[in-house]
Swiss-Prot record:
<comment type="subunit">
    <text>Homodimer.</text>
</comment>
<dbReference type="InterPro" id="IPR038578">
    <property type="entry name" value="GT29-like_sf"/>
</dbReference>
<feature type="glycosylation site" description="N-linked (GlcNAc...) asparagine">
    <location>
        <position position="206"/>
    </location>
</feature>
<feature type="binding site">
    <location>
        <position position="167"/>
    </location>
    <ligand>
        <name>CMP-N-acetyl-beta-neuraminate</name>
    </ligand>
</feature>
<dbReference type="GO" id="GO:0003828">
    <property type="term" value="F:alpha-N-acetylneuraminate alpha-2,8-sialyltransferase activity"/>
</dbReference>
<feature type="glycosylation site" description="N-linked (GlcNAc...) asparagine">
    <location>
        <position position="113"/>
    </location>
</feature>
<keyword id="KW-0735">Signal-anchor</keyword>
<protein>
    <recommendedName>
        <fullName>Alpha-N-acetylneuraminate alpha-2,8-sialyltransferase ST8SIA3</fullName>
        <ecNumber>2.4.3.-</ecNumber>
        <ecNumber>2.4.3.8</ecNumber>
    </recommendedName>
</protein>
<dbReference type="GO" id="GO:0097503">
    <property type="term" value="P:sialylation"/>
</dbReference>
<feature type="binding site">
    <location>
        <position position="336"/>
    </location>
    <ligand>
        <name>CMP-N-acetyl-beta-neuraminate</name>
    </ligand>
</feature>
<keyword id="KW-0328">Glycosyltransferase</keyword>
<feature type="active site" description="Proton donor/acceptor">
    <location>
        <position position="354"/>
    </location>
</feature>
<keyword id="KW-0812">Transmembrane</keyword>
<feature type="binding site">
    <location>
        <position position="190"/>
    </location>
    <ligand>
        <name>CMP-N-acetyl-beta-neuraminate</name>
    </ligand>
</feature>
<feature type="binding site">
    <location>
        <position position="301"/>
    </location>
    <ligand>
        <name>CMP-N-acetyl-beta-neuraminate</name>
    </ligand>
</feature>
<dbReference type="GO" id="GO:0008373">
    <property type="term" value="F:sialyltransferase activity"/>
</dbReference>
<dbReference type="Pfam" id="PF00777">
    <property type="entry name" value="Glyco_transf_29"/>
</dbReference>
Length: 380
């Protein structure tokens, strides 16, 4: 009996060890995945389409997450081959783009919701937050209202070609700076630095978003004179650009928002930056993208900027939209952001709130349909 039990234990342990060994092998070596209809185009949906590969060994941890997060979309080997070959010339489909713009405007009055204005709020009015409980409020102060524009900063504005620049590590070494700077209007995300990365991301900035949490993360909540000087100098570099501050997304931004308001009042007239403070815009934006089967906890800043750009731009080019930890052109490891310090590990914290692979899948399909140009290869 005892020998029988020992045999059973040994058998179980053997199976466990075998499973672990197989898992290690699957993570280290190339992993062949059964073909799926990832990209809704005939090329990828055809019966003869190639098998898919999660081909980068350095990406093994992301592959493991595929089983934990159903929104994680593997990238096809054929897409990589397509990028490495001479890409087919992208053609703008103006009719499709105008149709999409009309659809967006049916859900979102972009011009009106781009920013609160002095006439749209009153002192003492209580603002709620898009992603927080309705019990949380922010009272509009006289100082806050004084910083609001008289009219929407994008009222009657129209641009031919706009660049929406995300912060993906795929921009590292891309040499896309000159191409981006040729755009008539450049959207950037989350106050991303450009000075040390101009060759890859350009220097031109017409609008950048500024999540209030940036003040805490990079400027120590302006607690010291040095912190305040650093922030002032960063703002001065914007030189007339729009600083788009989504202060009403989360109630946790309230204290930082008040710090920002005090700072801008203190330096009134010393900075050329244009301030824009959107109200509760996300309920409208979310409604549109939900119709496109995109409904994460939070949309990314990049796709939000695309939404805004659709109202004032005749053509939109996307850069830095690639949420994966490897370069599809070289198969080398990538940082999450192009400005991350060398050696910084690719992060997947975004999975808590965003569906970046699903967003990428949608944008890639839009690229194929000619609605927007999605740059995934080097520009020079």
């Amino acid at each position: 009996m005892r020998n029988c039990k020992m045999a059973r234990v040994a058998s179980v342990l053997g199976l466990v060890m075998l499973s672990v060994a197989l898992l290690n092998l699957s993570l280290i070596s190339y992993v062949s995945l059964k073909k799926e209809n990832i990209f809704a185009t005939p090329k990828y949906a055809s019966p003869g389409a190639p098998r898919m590969y999660m081909f980068h060994a350095g990406y093994r941890s992301q592959f493991a997450l595929k089983f934990l997060d159903p929104s994680f979309v593997p990238i096809t080997n054929s897409l990589t081959q397509e990028l490495q070959e001479k890409p087919s010339k992208w053609t703008f489909n103006r009719t499709a783009f105008l149709h999409q713009r009309q659809e967006i405007l049916q859900h979102v009055d972009v011009i009106k919701n781009f920013s609160l204005t002095k006439n749209s709020v009153r002192i003492g009015q209580l603002m709620h937050y898009d992603y927080s409980s309705h019990k949380y409020v922010f009272s509009i102060s006289n100082n806050f209202r004084s910083l609001l524009p008289d009219v929407s900063p994008i009222m009657n504005k129209h641009y031919n070609i706009c660049a929406v620049v995300g912060n993906s590590g795929i921009l590292t070494g891309s040499q896309c700076g000159q191409e981006i700077d040729k755009s008539d209007f450049v959207f950037r995300c989350n106050f991303a630095p450009t000075e040390a990365f101009q060759r890859d991301v350009g220097r031109k900035t017409n609008l950048t978003t500024f999540n209030p949490s940036i003040l805490e993360k990079y400027y120590n909540n302006l607690l010291t004179i040095q912190d305040r000087n650093n922030f002032f100098l960063s703002l001065k570099k914007l030189d007339g650009a729009i600083l788009w501050i989504p202060a009403f997304f989360f109630h946790t931004s309230a204290t930082v928002t008040r710090t920002l308001v005090d700072f801008f009042v203190e330096h009134r007239g010393q900075l050329k930056v244009q301030l824009a403070w959107p109200g509760n815009i996300m309920q409208h934006v979310n409604r549109y993208w939900k119709n496109k089967h995109l409904s994460p906890k939070r949309l990314s800043t990049g796709i939000l900027m695309y939404t805004l750009a659709s109202a004032i731009c005749e053509e939109i080019h996307l850069y830095g939209f690639w949420p994966f930890g490897f370069d599809p052109n070289t198969r080398e490891d990538l940082p999450y952001h192009y400005y991350d310090k060398k050696g910084t590990k690719f992060t997947t914290k975004w999975q808590e709130s965003h569906q970046l692979p699903a967003e990428f899948q949608l944008l890639y399909r839009m690229h194929g349909e000619g609605l927007t140009k999605l740059t995934l290869s080097h520009c020079a």
